[in-house]
Regions:
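N-terminal Rossmann-like NAD(P) cofactor-binding subdomain of oxidoreductases
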Residues: 1-151
Length: 152
């Protein structure tokens, strides 16, 4: 089974910690985990699979030799670091609102259109939390009776 080199950007925040928990819970095969955070949090540790992993400062040079970067930072920092992540060849899965409306960046909800991620776009965005919850219900209804249009 292939193992992945994954960075979690914003690893010490609530969303970053949840990303680490999900990687562990779903037993995602990780060969290298790189927790990244602000200079203030660098040097602290995060618990992953029973090990304390040192947190490094998020900086452009940190994105080398990675398969995926999971972003749990604000839009400004996300936009700032995106070019370096893309240059590295890693897929950037961003949780901020930075790229949600950008043409060519797929908005992916795994349970609904997760197959779109298989083409390995350089950046993947997710809709905001309210939209995701609404789409989960709408997708279930759509499977029962195709919805032609929706007005919000």
């Amino acid at each position: 089974m292939k193992e992945y080199r994954i960075a979690v950007l914003g690893a010490t925040g609530a969303v970053g910690r949840e990303m680490l928990r999900v990687l562990e819970e779903y037993q995602i095969p990780v060969s290298r985990l790189l927790p990244l955070a602000s200079a203030r949090s660098a040097g602290s540790t995060v618990l992953f699979r029973g090990q304390q992993i040192p947190v490094e400062e998020a900086a452009e040079e940190r994105f080398r030799e990675l398969d995926f970067v999971l972003g749990a930072v604000g839009s400004g920092l996300s936009r700032q670091l995106r070019p370096a992540i893309e240059r590295s060849g890693a897929v950037y899965i961003d949780n901020s609102s930075a790229f949600r409306l950008e043409e060519g960046v797929p908005l992916i909800v795994p349970e609904i259109n997760g197959q779109e991620a298989l083409s390995r776009p350089p950046v993947i965005a997710n809709p905001n939390c309210s939209t995701i919850i609404t789409l989960m219900a709408v997708a279930a209804l759509h499977r029962l009776s195709p919805i032609q249009s929706m007005v919000a």
